[in-house]
From Swiss-Prot:
It comes from Xanthomonas oryzae pv. oryzae (strain KACC10331 / KXO85). The gene is apt. Homodimer. Its EC number is 2.4.2.7. This is Adenine phosphoribosyltransferase. It catalyses: AMP + diphosphate = 5-phospho-alpha-D-ribose 1-diphosphate + adenine. CDD domains: PRTases_typeI. The keyword Glycosyltransferase applies. Keywords: Cytoplasm, Glycosyltransferase, Purine salvage, Transferase. The lineage of its organism: Bacteria, Pseudomonadati, Pseudomonadota, Gammaproteobacteria, Lysobacterales.
Length: 186
């Protein structure tokens, strides 16, 4: 079982300068939205490595079969975490990007709606997975990934995000019985 004492969504142990590396982009992708850009943090090798280590730490003793990484920046974080945790990686993509048979889930965003998909046979039933994304905003994307994993009869052991936007209350849409860790909160 995962020790979720650090899953409350606060920056309890990360360096303060991590949050300084995440910049606000006003009116992106639409007017009225303030986008949290994590790419400056990703571009710094030592900070990226230490942030990944912080994200991975609670899951190190949790048996996992794969990390599900949500497009697009969840791919980067998810694949790196899968390597760190010595497990597989499965992409959760936007529609039309995966060949073969897929399952699709629609969800609401802070600024509209979107859809994500996974391969039908990506993992065997009962596989233990960790869902990873870059930012938890309204919770729609994570909730959709949770729904896809449930449709595939996967065991969701938890979710990890680099950034949680507390004002948007996305955590309230998450499953109460599934741990959710946010490394940084704004």
């Amino acid at each position: 079982m995962t020790d979720c004492s650090r899953c409350a969504g606060t920056n309890a142990s990360g360096p303060n300068h991590w949050s300084e590396r995440i910049r606000d982009i006003v009116d992106f992708p639409k007017p009225g939205i303030v986008f949290k850009d994590i790419t400056p943090l990703l571009s710094d090798g030592p900070d990226f490595a230490s942030a990944l280590d912080e994200m991975a730490q609670p899951w190190r003793t949790t048996p996992l079969d794969a990390v599900l990484g949500i497009e697009a920046l969840g791919f980067i974080l998810g694949a790196a975490l899968a390597r760190e945790l010595r497990t597989g990686f499965v992409p959760v993509r936007k529609p039309g990007k995966l060949p073969g048979r897929t399952l699709i889930r629609e969800y609401a965003l802070e600024y509209g709606t979107d859809r994500i998909e996974m391969h039908e046979g990506a993992l065997p039933r009962g596989a233990r997975v960790l869902i990873v994304d870059d930012v938890l905003a309204t919770g729609g994307t994570l909730r959709a990934a949770l729904g896809l994993a449930a449709q595939l009869e996967l065991e969701i052991v938890g979710a990890a995000v680099l950034v949680e936007l507390l004002a948007l209350q996305g955590r309230q849409k998450w499953a109460d019985d599934v741990p959710l860790l946010a490394t940084l909160s704004f």
